[in-house]
Amino acid sequence: VHAVDGIDITLRENETLALVGESGSGKTTAGKAILRLLGKEAKISGSIRICGEDTASPKGKNLKALRQAAQIIFQDPFSSLDPRMTVGETLLEALESLRPDMSREEKSERIRGLLSRVGLREDALRRYPHEFSGGQRQRIAIARALAPEPKLIICDEPTSALDVSVQAQILNLLGRIQRETGIAYLLITHNFGVVEYIADRVAVMRSGKIVEEGPLEDVLQHPASTYTRELLDAVPRLGGI
């Protein structure tokens, strides 16, 4: 069984590609395949290149290099953070694992800078995830993803578990971070309102295959695929943004 078949996508620096489709279309599987998060039983063929490096079969140091180059923000900020670790410990763990080249002082400075970048105060370092709101937890998850200075972040439904007003704040934060760093986003979502707000290009998935891809305006205003037109008519929109 091929959960994802024949995927061919290119992401440039400072670009957001939205991967959209209904539940079961394969979009989350595609995102996890890039980061080698599917488990040993998953069979992946082809190439996955990040900054020219083929990461299709990473092991050992290569896997660590992949994790440094590409990170993920999960859908649920309530389960993606270890409840036993403070925010400071969570961010330090990411740096110790993926940036052993940094000194202790550099890591401390990096952690403080990450909190500032995502709009949290320094006293958050000593607090635990349950002490934060959903939006604040997602900011912590974003800071963790940014910790090793990746070139790519996969955003897997990063706002769907949040209130609409908070969704806008998180999307604005992601946009500002991209403008400041040039990072690329692969945005996995079913919400075309989110797509309209942040994406540069759109790829539409159905049954594990991409059925349409193009610039945002072309796909939304002049969809070539009947399936894309059906999605545009059926999926929820993000109000209030």
Sequence positions of predicted segments:
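ABC transporter nucleotide-binding domains
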Residues: 1-239
